[in-house]
């Protein structure tokens, strides 16, 4: 009986270890869970007209940008960008984070540089409520700035192991905004980032991380 119990324990432990994702899984085919656009650290420069408000950003535009990623998967193609077989959408995680944002102070004259951004992103991931998604490879974009003055959106592309919340890859990217209307214009910066990654950066990251 003791031998049986020990065998069950070993098998369960082995199964748990196998479920955890490693850095190499970022570059392998398979599934990825898209947790959305995390705006909890974001600042905005001149993105609204005179009638716009910071509350509008939190209540209207941030949900609109997240929903667009889901409603137009052919354009915002995470599977093609990151060479994955399937994308599982779980943007409720980012929605819960974004709903806690305080509107005051979001509109600024210039976006400040983040101190120790990788450590900050790691702390954000640790606190995520991923709901029923308990394992697998997670992906989130932590947006830091939408800047009309520079016509750019900046964000940290972040892969993590869902089971342990360990960050596997965190890379800063900047995309050029383009399009008509506030929603499409700033979503254009995300689209530009995806195209950059498809063209060269995913291959560059593979060489950077897997050659160590």
Each predicted region: which residue ranges?
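Compositionally biased, low-complexity repeat tracts
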Residues: 10-12, 26, 70, 134
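A structural "domain/chain start" motif
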Residues: 19-108, 210-212
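Surface-exposed, polar helix/loop patches in the mature regions of secreted/periplasmic/lumenal proteins
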Residues: 84-136, 140
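Active-site nucleophile-His-acid catalytic modules used for acyl/amide transfer and hydrolysis
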Residues: 143
């Amino acid at each position: 009986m003791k031998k049986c119990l020990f065998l069950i324990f070993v098998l369960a432990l082995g199964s748990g270890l196998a479920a955890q994702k490693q850095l190499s899984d970022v570059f392998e085919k398979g599934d990825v869970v898209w947790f959305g656009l995390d705006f909890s650290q974001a600042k905005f420069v001149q993105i609204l007209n005179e009638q716009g408000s910071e509350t509008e950003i939190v209540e209207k535009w941030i949900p609109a940008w997240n929903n667009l990623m889901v409603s137009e998967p052919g354009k915002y193609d995470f599977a093609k960008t990151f060479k994955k077989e399937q994308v599982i959408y779980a943007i409720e995680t980012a929605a819960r984070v974004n709903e806690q944002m305080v509107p005051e102070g979001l509109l600024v004259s210039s976006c400040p540089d983040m101190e120790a951004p990788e450590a900050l992103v790691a702390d954000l991931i640790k606190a995520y409520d991923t709901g029923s998604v308990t394992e697998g490879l997670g992906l989130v974009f932590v947006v830091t700035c939408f800047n009309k003055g520079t016509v750019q959106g900046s964000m940290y592309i972040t892969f993590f192991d869902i089971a342990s919340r360990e960050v596997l890859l965190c890379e800063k990217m900047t995309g050029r905004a383009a399009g008509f209307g506030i929603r499409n214009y700033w979503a254009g910066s995300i689209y530009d980032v995806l195209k950059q990654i498809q063209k060269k950066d995913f291959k560059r990251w593979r060489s950077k991380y897997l050659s160590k």
